[in-house]
Amino acid sequence: MSPETTNVAGHLRERGRTRRPRKFSKAAQVTNTPIFASFLQAGFECSTHKLKNGKRLDLVASTQHDRFVDLDYSRLRDFGIQTVREGLRWHLIERERGRYDFSSALTILRAAQRHGIEIIWDVFHFGWPDFLDIFSAEWANALTDLAGEFGRLLRAESSGKRFVAAVNEISFVAWGGGDDAFINPFCKGRGHELKRQLVRSSVRASRALRSELPDVQLVSPEPVIHIVGDPARPDDVRSAEAYRTSMFEAWDMLTGRLHPELGGDESILDIIGVNFYDRNQWWNFGQTIHRGEPEYRPFREILREVYCRYRRPLFVAETGTENADRPDWFAYVWDEVQAAIAAGIPVHGVCLYPILNHPGWEDDRHCYNGLWDYAEPDGNRKVYDPLAEEIRRRTSKERSICYESKLRST
């Protein structure tokens, strides 16, 4: 999800949490050693879902990242970025059930190898082939098979650390696709059903990845939110808190703490990705809460709450905003992350998402939300200087201090 979309929401918190003995995977152990090749990271928007009018999006193609990937990666060096987020374009890879063409992913993978770039891959990032129904058992089977095939590909074509998210933003897809009809499959009243399906599928796909790559580090990116109720209305306060804590449901299900019948356990959750935008806080069923307002919750507190609940290494998997607010927003998030680290929270990175301006999902409008603009015919992209300057200003403070010295266990 990019900042040009909408507020992120989950679903009302479920009751009947089941506690199970916790058995973390080796990769999930909290460490003071940096996990990623770089702390500052870049996310290449890769959504491929279909719109209500039947048009399929392909943001990798519309930003021409597939065409100019070498130039895109070479530009990252100017900012010390060595870690990126990319996604599989499932509709291109599996045009017929069980027949796989990974050429679109190999183009990205081999460019990354040429430039010394480390990739955090999403297997599923909102889009799937036309022949599948996301609510069906066959969809879960297909995602599991795709993950296994991709694991085999990574084993054959890459070395070193591998980071993979089976499903990106379970909560957002379940809300937007299952309750708000904002995104494919455009349903209402099926959010809980869709969330369970995505969790069940993610668990199976994660196990398929690990069967091929025992040392794979499984990443789970989810939106974090803050919602405030009307203090004069106790029912509204309770409703807001239930809504707010729904942001934990996907992670709770993946770990088997909630609905263990879906197959989750603690070993599925290695690294938590926290997705946080400038519209992720709002009044219950009301307006956005902005920074500077008394009800706005500091991001460092959200990071602490997530860490204390799961005791996993964290990174900011997505953050950004549009237009002239970009530099100020980056500075805010960066400073909050540094404050969290200083307080002992193991945050291992900040990913600017998206790193490239892109066409709007619904209207193709020019979204000025990246560090670089649309590609010119020769592949050159104009940098947004105010954001570039703010990035250099903030990151220069850290370059003389290796960031592992700032990470502390709590």
Go through the PLM ranges and name each one.
Residues 2-67, 73, 77-79, 94-410:
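Non-catalytic scaffold segments within catalytic domains of secreted glycoside hydrolases
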Residues 85-88:
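Active-site gating/metal-coordination segments in enzymes
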